[in-house]
Every structure is written in C-alpha cells, then in structure tokens.
Amino acid sequence: MIVLTIEEILKEVLNEIKPSKEDMEKLQLKANEIIDKIWEIVRENSYPILEVLLVGSSARNTNLKDDYDIDIFVLFDKSVSEDELEEIGLKIGTEAIKRLNGSYNINYASHPYVNGEVDGYEVDIVPCYKIDFGEKIISAVDRTPLHHKFLISRLNERLCDEVRLLKAFLKSLGLYGSDVKTKGFSGYLCELLILHYGSFINLLKEAQNWRIGKKIILKDIFEIYKDVDINKLKKFDEPFIVYDPVDLNRNVASPLSKDNFCRFIFYSRQFLKNPSIEFFKDYAKKLEEILENREHGYRLILKIPRENVVDDIIYPQMEKLQKSINKVIVKNEFVILNSKCFADDNYCYLYWEFLVYELPKIALREGPPVFEKERAERFLKKYGKVFIRDCKLFAYTEREYSHIIDLFKDIVNGNLQNISIPKYVNPRNGKIIELNSHGEHKQFNKECQ
C-alpha cells in the first residue's frame, strides 16, 4: 500500500476540486455578458447606478469545481430610497435575464433580489447601496461588495488554492455553510482564515490551540482603520469570533455552532496525525453510516406539517421546541441517547432515540439523613409514607409517565402546559411515528435528506 505525504494528498485533492481554466474563462465571459446587459438597461432608463460588480467565490477564484454561480451586485447611490432601490433593482434584474432568454424568480434577503438561470449558470442580481470602509451600512447586503474588494486585492493564486482545500475539507466534514441548518463556516470566513494563517495546513495546526471564545483580528484591520482600539471592539459571546474587516461590529463566525467549532478542531487533529485523502471524500456521511450501523434504543419521530416559512425561521423554532420537550423528558427520567431535527418542503421532523421506552411504574425517591430535622420533615410532608435505609429517608412514588409514548401523546394533545410552543412549529398538529427497525430508520433518513 502506497502511503502519501500530506503534500501529495493536498496536490491530488486540489487536482480534483479546482475548476479548469477553460471553465473559469467561460464563466467570466457569461458574467461579462450579463453585466453588459445590465449597463445597457441602466443607460436606457438613466437609473442612478454607480457600479455593477461581480462578487463571490467565482469572482475571486476560490470556488470549487461545479460551483459556477454568478453573483452580481448593482450598487446604488445612498440618496436613493430603499423602496426605489428595490423597485429599480428588480426591474434591472428581471429585464437583464429576460433579454438573455433566461428564467428567473424573486428571492428575499434583507430586501428582494432576482435569482435566475442563464445558459446553465445560476445567477443572482442583487441591488445594494455603495458604501466605503467605515461607513454605516443601510442593509446587510451592502457589506458584500466591500468583502469582495477587501479580498480580491489580498488573495493571490496560491492562497486561492488554499481556500479551496479548506472548503473541500469542511464540505466533506459537513461543516461548510453558514445557513441555520448547517451552522458551519461560510465561504467568506474560509477566505479570511486562509488570509490570516497563510495556508490550509497552518490553519489546522493553529486550530489545535483554539478554545471556546477564540478571537481573531486580522492585521489588515489596522491598515484600514488607523485609530482602531482593540480594547474597545464589540464583545461577542460566541464560540469563535472573527472580526469582519468591513464591519467591526460583526462577527463573521457567528453562525458557527459550538459543536461544529469543536468538530473542526478534532478532525483537523485527526488529519494531521493520520493524513488521508478520505478526509476530503464525504467523511461525515461515511462516519454517520458507521454510527448508524449499530444496535439502537427506542426511536420515534414527531412529524409536524411545515408552515410556509423559510429555513432561517423554521430551524430555530424546531430547535426551541425540541429543547423544551427535552426538559420535560429528562424531568420524567427518560434517558435521551440522541435528538435532532430536520425539515423538508412539507414537514418538520423532531427525532429522538431513548435508552428505553418504558420505565417501572414505581420510582424510588432518596431523601435527607434522618438527623436533618427540617429537611426530613419536608420530605415526609411531600411523600407521606417513608422508610429508612442507611440513615436516610426514602419513599416509593408512582410515575406520572412510565411509557414515553404516553408522554408524547399528552404533548400532541396539548395536555402539558410547560412546553414552550413556537409560532410556526406546533406539536399539537403533529403525528407520533415509532421507528421499530433499523431498515425503517435508514429508509426514513433517506427520504428526509
């Protein structure tokens, strides 16, 4: 068996994940064609546009193979009202795509923008205000052109390839993406980390010294903001803090969960210890399959019809409901082995695995030593019939719930008042599904991916 060095592994990975020069040239030509069409529309209507800018990983040459999205930002003067920006922005975006015989729809971020397809390329045309470094943003997307301008002048070809390696590593681990479902690393965060540490391997090595609350302030910040005082920077109560060079009041790493922060540290260590190309090939998915191929406890799903709201709203509400239910489950002494939530277009799924589904109807309650008069009297008053063992008071009580299904039936029927019910994920609309076999569980997971 041939053992590859880290350098050989990374070279092989890069050959697999880096887009070809020909593909990048085709993308640039198509992006230029769309930008030319936008300027054509702007001139025809005398719209107050200051700049049209190609942004994102494709524009900065940090994209992975088969990731050829075209993100175009249309920059307005700050004197334009937000209503006018939205109206003109949508007119420009829809008309440009129509003239190129593409298809489109309207999506929403901090304000509406046009998402479409032109000759096989996914295209976003986003209106925003043109601002300078240090200026107050008007909408969240105003930062994006500055992100691009900050990075494009600092990322050379070598660093771009290092970013690609990091993205591929994170993608394989299931840690790439800052959406509410993934809670991982954004592409912009990847670029900043490589800029800060200089290479993929240096980043992995330095990550071994990270702890919760790790803070990164890029040296470039001091070049942009001459009078910045690090002691007066905004404080963040988050596991990983990377100050945005474009907006020092923003933590670029805020979407990253504590567990995913720790996963990155752990798997970075494993890769450095035992380098393998497998870390770049759906590693998390394979690991999950291994973990699933085991004996299981009792599993059930609470299946709730999904309201017509975006993931950014539905996932936090599912998590809030599951945490609230978990408190009730633990209070009733059932042991949770695993719990998670996910959603498709039609339903929200809250999943649990329990050590056992049924407990004895009788529970033993341990009280204080008999010598502690006041506590002993309170225990006696609460339980009535008590007995003494090893100088302590004990009592037998009847459990309110001896079967987990009975507890969930009361949740679905609305009989428990101490469940915090979010606006868009109501357990009273739910259906309890028991997963009795391993095959049934695997099929369910497949359907819900």
UniProtKB/Swiss-Prot annotation:
Note the effect listed for residue 171 to A.
No decrease in both AMP and CMP incorporation
Task: Report which reactions are catalysed by this protein.
Answer: a tRNA precursor + 2 CTP + ATP = a tRNA with a 3' CCA end + 3 diphosphate; a tRNA with a 3' CCA end + 2 CTP + ATP = a tRNA with a 3' CCACCA end + 3 diphosphate
The GO terms this record gives for MF are: ATP binding; CCA tRNA nucleotidyltransferase activity; magnesium ion binding; tRNA binding
What's the EC number here?
2.7.7.72
Q: Summarize where Mg(2+) binds, as residue positions.
A: 69, 71, 124
Assembly mode: Homodimer.
Q: Which family does it belong to?
A: Belongs to the tRNA nucleotidyltransferase/poly(A) polymerase family. Archaeal CCA-adding enzyme subfamily.
The name of this protein is CCA-adding enzyme
Q: What organism is listed for this UniProt entry? A: Methanocaldococcus jannaschii (strain ATCC 43067 / DSM 2661 / JAL-1 / JCM 10045 / NBRC 100440) (Methanococcus jannaschii)
Q: Which gene encodes it?
A: cca
